[in-house]
């Protein structure tokens, strides 16, 4: 199952270095791959979170169509740009990395984050709280995943 959040803004970031500075300013331990400028990304973006590999999809979208899709009544402003962050898979870092990257991008561009699952808009400050909550939960998720993997390995040996 894939999850999606969107950011809306009136300007874009010109480089990965600018985006990375915004991420660093939030104090996130996320490092983006820097081989392609954000304006040319339309697909999977690789990175590292706390030294571990992570990825999420990053797609530019038509802002007006995306606001219409999300429910135009939710927006008090016609944004110029929209980007989707999509993640899924088995890597527990992906959701946290996507929220961190989206939060930093939204704050750096004066934008907002939209979580379609909740149907809710988040200011950059509120999105920061979500990203921090997800980050604090990572050690427990890692522990649970390791426990589950050990259990599965034991069950395989017994059969």
What are these regions (language model features)?
Residues 1-159:
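Acidic (Asp/Glu-rich) sequence patches and key acidic residues
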């Amino acid at each position: 199952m894939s999850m999606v959040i969107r950011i809306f803004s009136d300007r874009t970031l010109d480089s990965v270095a600018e985006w990375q500075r915004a991420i660093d300013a939030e104090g996130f331990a996320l490092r983006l791959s820097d081989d392609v400028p954000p304006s040319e990304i339309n697909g999977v973006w690789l990175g590292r979170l706390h030294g571990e590999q992570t990825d999420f999809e990053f797609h530019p979208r038509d802002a007006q169509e995306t606001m219409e899709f999300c429910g135009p009544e939710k927006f008090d402003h016609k944004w110029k740009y929209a980007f989707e962050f999509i993640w899924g898979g088995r890597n527990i870092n992906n959701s946290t990395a996507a929220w961190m990257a989206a939060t930093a991008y939204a704050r750096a561009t004066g934008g907002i984050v939209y979580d379609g699952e909740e149907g809710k808009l988040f200011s950059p400050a509120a999105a920061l709280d979500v990203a921090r909550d997800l980050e604090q939960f990572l050690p427990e998720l890692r522990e649970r995943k390791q426990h589950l993997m050990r259990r599965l390995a034991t069950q395989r040996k017994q059969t």
